[in-house]
Amino acid sequence: AKSVHHARVLIRQRHIRVGRQVVNVPSFMVRLDSQKHIDFSLISPFGGGRPGRVKRKNQKAAAKKASGGDGDEEDEE
């Protein structure tokens, strides 16, 4: 995280896990032996999960454009 505040936001948005447990409480006390198991959640876009809403929308638009246009254009004659 870029700052303490950013870390808090990542935790509240369920992007962080300790071991196999997803943490969403910023005051969660991590034991000393569990510190090495702090990682991004598997369902988080940061941890290799499904891309976020905006990225999926942009990928869909790029695929549509690559396949021959979006169909919204009208021919001007």
UniProtKB/Swiss-Prot annotation:
One GO-annotated biological process of the protein: ribosomal small subunit biogenesis
Gene Ontology MF terms in the entry: rRNA binding; structural constituent of ribosome
Biased composition (Basic residues): 52-63
Keywords linked to the UniProt accession: Ribonucleoprotein, Ribosomal protein
Pfam families documented for this protein: S4
Keyword Ribosomal protein carried by entry: yes
Family membership noted in the UniProt record: Belongs to the universal ribosomal protein uS4 family.
Protein name: Small ribosomal subunit protein uS4
Organism: Nicotiana tabacum (Common tobacco)
